[in-house]
From Swiss-Prot:
Belongs to the UPF0161 family. The keyword Magnesium does not apply. The keyword Membrane applies. Pfam families: YidD. Keywords: Cell inner membrane, Cell membrane, Membrane. This is Putative membrane protein insertion efficiency factor. It is found in: Cell inner membrane. Could be involved in insertion of integral membrane proteins into the membrane. It is a peripheral membrane protein. NCBIfam families: membrane protein insertion efficiency factor YidD.
C-alpha cells in the first residue's frame, strides 16, 4: 500500500504539478512533505499529516519553512 501511495504522489509531482502554476506557501512543497511523511510514518499517519498540511496551505496562512516532524503529532504547539 505504501508503495502505491508514494507512486501516486510521484505521478502527481512529475506529470500534474508542472502543468500548474506554483501555489504552495510552504517549503518543502505539500507534495514533497506528504511523500516524506508517508515514507517516515506509513500510509495512514503520513496521509493524515499531508492532509493537515494541505488544509493549512491557503491565502490565510503565511506559510514558510515547515518540515515533517521527527515524531508524529497532528497538532503542534508553539513553544514561544
Amino acid at each position: 500500500m505504501k508503495k502505491i501511495v508514494l507512486t501516486l504522489i510521484n505521478f502527481y509531482r512529475k506529470y500534474i504539478s508542472p502543468s500548474k502554476p506554483p501555489t504552495c506557501r510552504f517549503t518543502p512543497t505539500c507534495s514533497a512533505y506528504t511523500f516524506e511523511a508517508v515514507q517516515r510514518f506509513g500510509v495512514f499517519k503520513g496521509l493524515l499529516l499531508g492532509t493537515w498540511r494541505i488544509l493549512r496551505c491557503n491565502p490565510f496562512n503565511k506559510g514558510g519553512y515547515d518540515p515533517v516532524p521527527e515524531e508524529f503529532k497532528l497538532l503542534r504547539r508553539n513553544t514561544k
